[in-house]
C-alpha cells in the first residue's frame, strides 16, 4: 500500500573500530570518526547505535554504559566542550550490560536515538559497571528515519 509509514535505514558507519580499555567510571571518545547527519546519514535525524565489547571480569548485571555526543560546528566551526565524567554534554542513551565476559553486542536502550546532533563526536562513559570495558570495543551508527511508502 502506498503512503503508509515505513522505516528506512542508511549506511552503517564505524565511529570506533578498536577502542582502548575504559575503566569503571571513566570516559572515552569513539575517536575513529565523527558522525554528520547530512554527510553520513542522508539527512536522517535519528540513529541506531550498537556497542560491541567484552569485560575481563563480569560487570554488575543491568548496569549501563552511557553514550554522549559532543556537538561540533555549533557556531561556524566552533565546537562545544568535550564531556567529562562529572559533566556530561548531550546525553544520547545507555547500553545495558549483561554479567558475562563474552563479547556483547548491545543495542542502545530504546533501540534508536531520536534527533541526534547535526554533527558530533561520540563518547562512552563506563558509569558504574564495576569493571573495565576491555580494549577492542567498537561503536557503530546506522542512520534511520520514517517516510511515506512509495
Name each region found by the language model.
Residues 94-102:
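Short proline/glycine- and polar residue-rich coil/turn motifs
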Residues 37, 49-59:
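Short amphipathic, basic-aromatic surface patches that mediate peripheral association
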Residues 1-15, 116, 126-150:
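C-terminal interaction-tip segments
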Residues 44-51, 113-134:
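Noncatalytic modules at the cell exterior or secretory-pathway interfaces
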Residues 2-45:
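Solvent-exposed, flexible loop/coil segments flanking beta-strands in beta-rich domains
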Residues 102-112:
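Exposed aromatic-hydrophobic patches
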Residues 60-67:
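Short coil-to-beta strand junction motifs in C2/discoidin
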Residues 73-91:
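Acidic Ser/Thr/Pro-rich low-complexity disordered segments
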Amino acid at each position: 500500500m502506498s503512503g503508509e509509514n515505513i522505516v528506512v535505514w542508511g549506511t552503517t558507519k564505524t565511529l570506533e573500530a578498536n577502542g582502548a580499555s575504559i575503566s569503571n567510571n571513566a570516559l572515552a571518545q569513539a575517536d575513529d570518526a565523527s558522525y554528520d547527519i547530512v554527510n553520513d546519514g542522508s539527512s536522517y535525524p535519528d540513529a541506531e547505535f550498537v556497542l560491541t565489547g567484552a569485560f575481563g571480569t563480569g560487570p554488575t548485571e543491568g548496569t549501563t554504559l552511557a553514550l554522549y555526543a559532543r556537538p561540533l560546528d555549533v557556531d561556524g566551526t566552533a565546537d562545544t566542550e568535550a564531556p567529562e565524567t562529572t559533566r556530561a554534554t548531550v546525553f544520547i542513551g545507555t547500553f545495558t550490560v549483561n554479567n558475562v565476559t563474552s563479547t556483547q553486542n548491545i543495542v542502545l536502550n530504546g533501540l534508536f536515538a531520536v534527533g541526534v546532533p547535526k554533527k558530533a563526536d561520540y563518547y562512552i562513559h563506563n558509569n558504574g559497571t564495576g569493571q573495565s570495558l576491555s580494549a577492542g570495543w567498537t561503536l557503530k551508527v546506522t542512520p534511520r528515519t520514517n517516510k511515506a511508502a512509495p
